[in-house]
Amino acid sequence: MENQERKPRRRRRRRPQEGSQGGPQDHVEIIPLGGMGEIGKNITVFRFRDEIFVLDGGLAFPEEGMPGVDLLIPRVDYLIEHRHKIKAWVLTHGHEDHIGGLPFLLPMIFGKESPVPIYGARLTLGLLRGKLEEFGLRPGAFNLKEISPDDRIQVGRYFTLDLFRMTHSIPDNSGVVIRTPIGTIVHTGDFKLDPTPIDGKVSHLAKVAQAGAEGVLLLIADATNAERPGYTPSEMEIAKELDRVIGRAPGRVFVTTFASHIHRIQSVIWAAEKYGRKVAMEGRSMLKFSRIALELGYLKVKDRLYTLEEVKDLPDHQVLILATGSQGQPMSVLHRLAFEGHAKMAIKPGDTVILSSSPIPGNEEAVNRVINRLYALGAYVLYPPTYKVHASGHASQEELKLILNLTTPRFFLPWHGEVRHQMNFKWLAESMSRPPEKTLIGENGAVYRLTRETFEKVGEVPHGVLYVDGLGVGDITEEILADRRHMAEEGLVVITALAGEDPVVEVVSRGFVKAGERLLGEVRRMALEALKNGVREKKPLERIRDDIYYPVKKFLKKATGRDPMILPVVIEG
């Protein structure tokens, strides 16, 4: 028995934990469902084996050619299918393009409640709670977990997240160091490297440098301003310029900026208080964001905020009004003031209007229309770049170079930008001697597989956009949008035909050329002839409808050069 060979005991294979190494076939899948090749709808899925965490869940705003559409949100079929694998949802900050989609996405994926932890900083969760309540959801039904912008989170068995504070155009903004069994990923989140932020809280680059020293497998970084050379101006520079122009304004001052730009609003309030002006706010989103920021201590006022009614009878030099409308939105306060449609107040000569913002791509014409109207009403209008009253919240080229140098990643994925921004970031990296093949240009819906040695696109998941129209989500198709554009551009002609013993036709046009009685009379005659023939020959209603549609379409095109939407409605009498 003593000489009998002993069999080695089989050891149980341990699952990889934080800092441990996965097997040679292990990989992380990175799946952007929004935010690649576009501005907005930011949401990214990270998966290792059977565990997922999601980063952000944003929305986008409709472009000019999307009539009737209120919001755009990303399709999340993949997350609905794999909901049981989701271990956490992590929010980098409270901007709409990062959390605005959650009141729609959370019920789609989880229903009206979920135990999955949703991590966010204090202001971020404060804004999210307000959004959930606004859409009839109970914040308490979702597992909202407050963290600081520099916390560590253990997500499931495989992901350890070290958040790091990054300056941006909203407080409590973070990037994330993602430690996985195969290596480290650094995600910058939205950022700029502001040396003198309004709240004094600078970017925590020590964590970025530490990750770089340990070795970064993949860098995912903000490409928004990759075309801009130099550095993005500090928010404190903008505060000084706002102080200067508000101090010199002779009459009332109106300021518009993004409602979520708490630091900019704080700068305006400081200047108003310095020069003895009472601050009133007008506009739903401005009031909502500021109320939450005040309650949570992110916005400070010496006195209090006033209503329009309280300041309208004060001397002009004692009044400052913060208003919505930085993007020229038709129902915003500034737009209504510019077009003399505001019920409580009107622009008058001697007023100063400050646009402390820059137009989002696609909104330039709307903003210019508002500016021109304000000038026509006698206001002084101050806007960038003529006045230094706005700075971007995103890093320019020299700041992006610093992040690349601190992390020296093996692989690189430019994120948060249109294709031109991504490409310019790629070229910037190549100018620093990075191999071109180590950088991928991200696409929504792509599945990227990251191993210790490779980073490649290996497939796609269902992706795209859902249109939000009032209470409807996803029930607007591209075909419906095309119909709406057609009606908006060419107009509508409705032909109502009653098929019976005594056929009757009525014709109504909207948004079409000024159709005289002769033109509409000819349409009515053609439709009535087709209707009578159809009734006599006992044709199906669909066939009668076609017999009306095609001749009328051809006639109107020839007579007017226009191609209106023609809607024949044939009713059996």
Swiss-Prot record:
GO cellular component terms given for this protein: cytoplasm
Task: State the InterPro entries in the record.
Answer: Metallo-B-lactamas, RibonucZ/Hydroxyglut_hydro, RMMBL, RNase_J, RNase_J_2, RNase_J_b_CASP, RNase_J_bac, RNase_J_C
Q: Which GO terms describe its molecular function?
A: 5'-3' RNA exonuclease activity; identical protein binding; RNA binding; RNA endonuclease activity; zinc ion binding
SMART domains to which the protein is assigned, alphabetical: Lactamase_B (SM00849)
Q: What name has this protein been given in UniProt?
A: Ribonuclease J
Q: Entry's CDD domains?
A: RNaseJ_MBL-fold
Q: Which UniProt keywords apply?
A: Cytoplasm, Endonuclease, Exonuclease, Hydrolase, Metal-binding, Nuclease, RNA-binding, rRNA processing, Zinc
Site described as Substrate binding, located at: A60
Q: What are the required cofactors? A: Zn(2+)
Note down the stretches annotated as region Disordered.
Answer: 1-29
The record lists the effect of H95A as: Catalytically inactive
- Function noted in UniProt: An RNase that has endonuclease and possibly 5'-3' exonuclease activity. Probably involved in maturation of rRNA and in some organisms also mRNA maturation and/or decay.
